[in-house]
């Protein structure tokens, strides 16, 4: 857009570009063209905690998951009716992150999306936004080896951490987040989001799978 002597160009993403401005000629002015080189950088993420932000884990523009643990801070807590404990370790030498999309409206509300750049240790734990294979239910013997790239089945502690950090309770309409009642963990234990309990392995039950990863 043009306003007086100011030309405004909307950014379409990070990177370098040349902007060419061409003014039209008239009786008092000859046509002139000027080219400017610009570099657009994404905003570096500087908040103390990334919990509750969305994650684009492979920088392809698709939002992949919700961040539920931040290894920069670590932490601990309890979740559920039986107050199952969880612990988040602390790590150093972490990757740098930037805001790749602002105000993304997803199943966990409206929040910015983070992506990683550079090298270092993964700072966050991320849960996928949807169930594996469209929510298909599996016996554990069929579910235990499910993986997808760097995504794998969460441990029971990871599930407890996820539910505790995002305050997922049986009374807070967890289904609004796109979550099912019950999920397998990698050990065969399973978590009941609908009632706040965790359970030992059962060979007779069928549950969906949701994957997690560090990022």
Feature names for model-found ranges:
Residues 42-150, 192-194, 198-215:
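Short, compositionally biased
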Residues 21-23, 29, 127, 139, ...:
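Mature, Sec-exported extracytoplasmic domains of Gram-positive
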Residues 2-4, 31-33, 120-122, 147, ...:
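Short, solvent-exposed coil/turn segments
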Residues 15, 130-132, 157-159:
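Histidine- and/or cysteine-centered catalytic micro-motif in compact active-site loops
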Residues 10, 27-29, 117-118, 175, ...:
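Sterically constrained small-residue positions within well-ordered secondary structures
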Residues 8-9, 150-152:
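A glycine-rich, coil/turn loop motif that links secondary-structure elements
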Residues 1-43:
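Extracytoplasmic soluble-region selector
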Residues 156-215:
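C-terminal, surface-exposed recognition/capping segments
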């Amino acid at each position: 857009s043009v306003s007086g002597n100011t030309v405004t160009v909307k950014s379409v993403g990070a990177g370098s570009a040349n902007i060419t401005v061409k003014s039209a000629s008239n009786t008092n002015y000859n046509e002139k063209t000027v080219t400017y080189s610009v570099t657009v950088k994404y905003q570096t993420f500087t908040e103390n905690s990334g919990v509750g932000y969305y994650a684009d884990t492979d920088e392809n523009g698709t939002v992949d998951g919700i961040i539920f643990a931040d290894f920069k801070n670590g932490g601990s807590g309890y979740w559920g009716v039986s107050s199952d404990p969880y612990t988040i370790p602390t790590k150093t030498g972490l990757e740098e992150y930037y805001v790749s999309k602002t105000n993304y409206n997803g199943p966990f509300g409206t929040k910015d999306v983070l992506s990683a750049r550079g090298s270092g240790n993964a700072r966050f734990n991320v849960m996928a936004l949807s169930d594996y294979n469209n929510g298909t239910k599996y016996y554990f013997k069929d579910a235990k080896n499910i993986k997808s790239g760097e995504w794998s089945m969460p441990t029971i502690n990871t599930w407890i951490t996820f539910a505790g950090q995002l305050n997922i309770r049986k009374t807070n309409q967890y289904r609004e987040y796109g979550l099912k009642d019950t999920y397998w963990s990698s050990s065969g234990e399973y978590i009941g989001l609908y009632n706040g309990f965790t359970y030992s392995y059962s060979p007779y039950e069928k549950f969906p799978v949701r994957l997690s990863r560090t990022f």
